Swiss-Prot record:
Organism of provenance: Schizosaccharomyces pombe (strain 972 / ATCC 24843) (Fission yeast)
Transmembrane segments annotated in the record for this chain: 2-22, 397-417, 448-468, 481-501
Biased composition (Acidic residues): 665-675
Pfam families linked: Acyltransferase
Gene Ontology, cellular component aspect: endoplasmic reticulum; endoplasmic reticulum membrane
EC id: 2.3.-.-
One of the GO biological process terms: phospholipid biosynthetic process
Entry annotated with the keyword Coiled coil: no
Example GO molecular function: glycerol-3-phosphate O-acyltransferase activity
Domain of life (superkingdom): Eukaryota
Full protein name: Uncharacterized acyltransferase C1718.04
UniProt xrefs under InterPro entries: GPAT/DAPAT (IPR052744), Plipid/glycerol_acylTrfase (IPR002123)
Sorted UniProt keywords: Acyltransferase, Endoplasmic reticulum, Membrane, Phosphoprotein, Transferase, Transmembrane, Transmembrane helix
Places the protein is found: Endoplasmic reticulum membrane
Length: 675
């Protein structure tokens, strides 16, 4: 990294946008990131076009202090603003075949009983293309390099197209459309990556090759494997490692959504793959490395075969989680992932199929009533209390709306412009892409870009307008010294008003979401449906819990339902000071975990005697250590617990000396994360 000051300054400026757009960004497993040495960080799924690399660089800088170089598409690198930021961050441009691909003439097909590498054409002009070009099937069904061209209607590819989708379109009577991308020389990219890695740099890339909004990962490109093998073949003692990173979002395109970055264990490429690569058996070596990376990414991402399955899995997680349990955000992601693994393994089991259909029906009933799952389980039948809560929350919502109104009006031009421009850009990207479903991976990027460009101009205009109004109408005498402070005050005042509106608005939105179920409970015709649905939910909870507890041990040997069902009960909704305490304690945990190289927010594969040691247990204890290593681990765990208890006791003393404010709703509950 040549210009560290420019890197840190630009990252700090853009971090303001990230903190403004996302309500919460968490990291899990950051202790696994090597602090020094060459590192290729492999991130997936690529669900937010330019936001993903920005969050990745920001969290790596905050958590482990490493500056990261990103591989960026040359098409984006040539854009004025994106190129400027990419150069400031030391990004490496990569020319992608799909950016240069052109639509081929006619249709292509293969003969069912013939050579699958022989591609036949109808009304095609294969001789216009060259050997080495890439033949691309639609919807990312597959690609292959052209080995030889025999005529305008016959060519051979280096390897046959594999996969059910590729075979279906190529064997269809009408044939398949296709694109042809020219051969690209990536020597510069490989040399530049190798040069930086040898110097101990951290290179991050997205091996899917582009952003998308699909619920599953796209096939990985071979570039990451070639970069790693090329570096190790020439510098075998450089100590290069690969690190998987899962980019997990809750509604990535929405304002004030949440994100979790999960880092897996570092991978070292086996020597046999490097030897195969040197021996010109590159296909075997590259495929072996890609399989390693793909398996590692599966352990840190949530992969669902389709959107409907993802919704069922998230509903299943809410039904399985006891109401008194409050999961941390990384734990929600981990439980979703394990449920998907279990579903894919047992999806043909009649019990799973029957439960799948029941949950789908339950979700549809929630949608028709306009309710969310956590609102059903928390509804209590007492008309007087329901009416009291409804009136109280409506009054509170009115006051909060008044507080948020000035800032909302000031910022409304940015909101309107960002929404319209992002929708247009998403539509254009969807039209040009063969892998996107709705183009949602573009929305957050363009919302942030529009806000970054418009906000300084808009608030400068407000400041000038304020100064003009005060000077023209002599609201402050021109002879007063305070007249010179007007530009400074107005420059800071309007952003502060907008930020206050943001905080008021968050609380107001949470209260607004809680009003509908209260209103429905007061209507006799709707109340019956709500309470019938509540009974159905109780039955679903019992069925889901029973089935997971039966099937879980078959797939996960260390599965223990008591670790969830016996967790301490969730306390009452925290006050402002209690939330501040929780945030401080979380910070202390992070600091202590770095000190002891232990991630307290992740599942640690400890020996069996240590699995009954809980950080916040009222009476922490451990079984007698069987050897010196376990004893050392127990000592470290006790040290961390004692430090946290002492810190928590000091802060609780401070809190008790203050007046506790009235109960307020400050954030969405865990149950709302995936609704």
């Amino acid at each position: 990294m040549q210009h560290t000051f420019i890197y840190d300054t630009c990252l700090w400026i853009l971090s303001i946008l990230i903190d403004f757009f996302f309500r919460e960004v968490k990291t899990r497993g950051s202790f696994r990131v090597p602090r020094k040495g060459p590192l290729i960080l492999v991130a997936a799924p690529h669900a937010n076009q330019f936001v993903d690399p920005l969050i990745l660089m920001l969290q790596l800088r905050r958590e482990v202090g490493r500056r990261t170089s990103i591989l960026v598409a040359a098409k984006s690198y040539r854009q004025r603003f994106i190129g400027l930021m990419s150069r400031a961050f030391g990004a490496i441009p990569v020319e992608r075949a799909q950016d240069l691909a052109i639509r081929g003439e006619g249709k292509i097909f293969v003969v069912a009983e013939g050579d699958k590498t022989a591609i036949h054409g109808k009304d095609t002009l294969f001789t216009k293309h060259s050997v080495g070009d890439t033949l691309l099937l639609p919807n990312n069904y597959g690609s292959s390099h052209i080995a030889s061209i025999k005529s305008d209607t016959l060519l051979y590819v280096k390897r046959e197209f594999r996969g059910e989708d590729a075979e279906r379109v190529l064997l269809s009577p009408e044939g398949s459309s296709y694109k042809v991308a020219p051969e690209i020389d990536q020597t510069y990219v490989y040399n530049e990556v190798r040069r930086r890695l040898v110097k101990g740099a951290c290179i991050a890339l997205f091996p899917e090759g582009g952003s998308h909004d699909r619920p599953e990962m796209l096939p990985l490109k071979a570039g990451v494997a070639i970069m790693a093998l090329e570096t190790l073949s020439q510098h075998p003692d450089c100590g290069l490692q690969l690190l998987p990173c899962g980019m997990n979002y809750f509604h990535p395109h929405r304002f004030r959504s949440r994100a979790v970055l999960e880092f897996g264990s570092p991978l070292s490429i086996p020597t046999e793959y490097v030897e195969l690569y040197k021996a010109k058996k590159r296909r075997e070596a590259i495929q072996g490395v890609l399989d390693m990376i793909y398996d590692a990414l599966l352990s840190v991402t949530v992969q669902a075969p389709d959107y409907e399955t993802l919704m069922v899995i998230q509903a299943c997680r809410r039904l399985y989680k006891p109401a008194h349990i409050q999961f941390a955000l990384p734990k929600v992601v981990d439980l979703n992932r394990k449920l998907i693994v279990g579903y894919n393994h047992f999806k043909h089991d009649p019990r799973v199929i029957r439960l799948h259909d029941k949950i789908l029906l339950y979700n549809r009933q929630l949608y028709r009533l306009g309710l969310r799952d956590h609102q059903v389980q928390s509804l209590q039948y007492s008309r007087f209390m329901i009416l009291y809560k409804l009136v109280y929350r409506c009054c509170k919502l009115f006051l909060l709306a008044l507080g948020a109104l000035p800032g909302a009006i000031l910022f409304s031009p940015v909101f309107i412009a960002a929404h319209r421009i992002s929708v247009k850009k998403a539509a254009a990207a969807l039209k040009a892409s063969s892998v996107k479903i709705q183009g949602r991976d573009i929305l957050a990027t363009w919302k942030l870009l529009v806000a970054l460009g418009m906000t300084p101009i808009l608030y400068s205009f407000y400041a000038l307008l304020c100064c003009y109004y005060i000077y023209s109408y002599k609201l402050i005498p021109h002879s007063s010294i305070f007249v010179y402070t007007v530009p400074i005050i107005s420059t800071f005042l309007f952003p502060m008003v907008t930020y206050a509106a943001l905080r008021f608005g968050e609380v107001a939105v949470d209260i607004y979401k809680s009003i509908r179920p209260l209103f429905l409970a007061l209507i006799p015709s709707k109340a019956n449906a709500v309470y019938i649905l509540k009974d159905e939910r109780k039955q679903l909870v019992a069925e889901v819990t029973d089935l997971i507890n039966k099937l879980g041990p078959e797939l996960f040997p260390d599965f223990d339902p008591d670790r969830i069902t016996t967790t301490i009960e969730k306390p009452e909704r925290p006050s402002r000071f209690a939330r501040r305490l929780s945030s401080s304690v979380a910070s202390d945990v992070d600091n202590l975990s770095q000190l002891h190289d232990t991630d307290l927010n992740s599942e640690v594969s400890a020996p069996a005697p240590l699995q009954n040691v809980y950080l916040y247990s009222p009476n922490p204890s451990a079984l007698p250590p069987s050897d010196e290593e376990e004893k050392d681990i127990n000592d470290k765990a006790k040290l961390i617990r004692n430090a946290l208890r002492q810190r928590m006791g000091q802060r609780m003393t401070e809190i008790r000396s203050r007046d506790t404010p009235p109960e307020e709703v400050f954030s969405e509950s865990d149950e709302e994360l995936s609704d």
